[in-house]
Amino acid sequence: MDDCAYVTWSTGIGVGLCVDGHVLRGKNGNAGHAGHSFVVDDQDALCGCGNRGDVESLVAGNAIARRFGHDAADWLGRASAGDAAAQENVDGLCRILGRMLYNLVATLDLQRISLGGSVFWHHRAYLLPRLQAHVQAHFPALTQGVILAPAGLGDRVGDYAALALVPD
């Protein structure tokens, strides 16, 4: 697959990009910091990088604990079990991350986004259809056929990704 991304949803939001069959690194090696992009206007959420209201400040695991008073695992578990308040909050998280995913698809014409990270991985059955719905809700000419899927390497994907970047 020549045009794809890996998105980690964990204590931060990170993205690895492959465009035209090549890893996209950027001028300073910082391509993929989409977690520091803005998709809503929320100046109350402070990110570790100093931004206010970026995606990471709103949906990362530590942001969930800060915003909702529950750690991510507990809050997502409650949402999965049917807790209405947790479901409403998690739907909001998926809307924010879904917008970021859509922006990646719209900007880079991606075929596939593989998802991983501890927040996503442990609740993937609940989160994946919600994220897919948010991506597919916009501009079908761009999003039709785009695949969102759990990372095939599971919770080891970060290890392999780091090894892939080691120079020969």
In which residue ranges do the predicted regions lie?
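A short, polar/charged loop-to-alpha-helix boundary motif
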Residues: 30-42
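Short beta-strand scaffold segments in enzyme catalytic cores
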Residues: 6, 13-18
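Short glycine-rich anion-binding loops that position phosphate/pyrophosphate groups of nucleotides
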Residues: 10-12, 119-120
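A structure-centric signal for secondary-structure junctions around beta-strands
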Residues: 1, 12, 31-34, 145
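Short beta-strand-to-turn element immediately C-terminal to the catalytic PLP-Schiff-base lysine
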Residues: 16-20, 24-26, 39-40
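Short Gly/Pro-enriched turn/cap motifs at secondary-structure boundaries
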Residues: 7-8, 27-28
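ATP-binding/phosphotransfer module of carbohydrate and carboxylate kinases, centering on a glycine-rich
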Residues: 2-3, 23, 41-47, 51-168
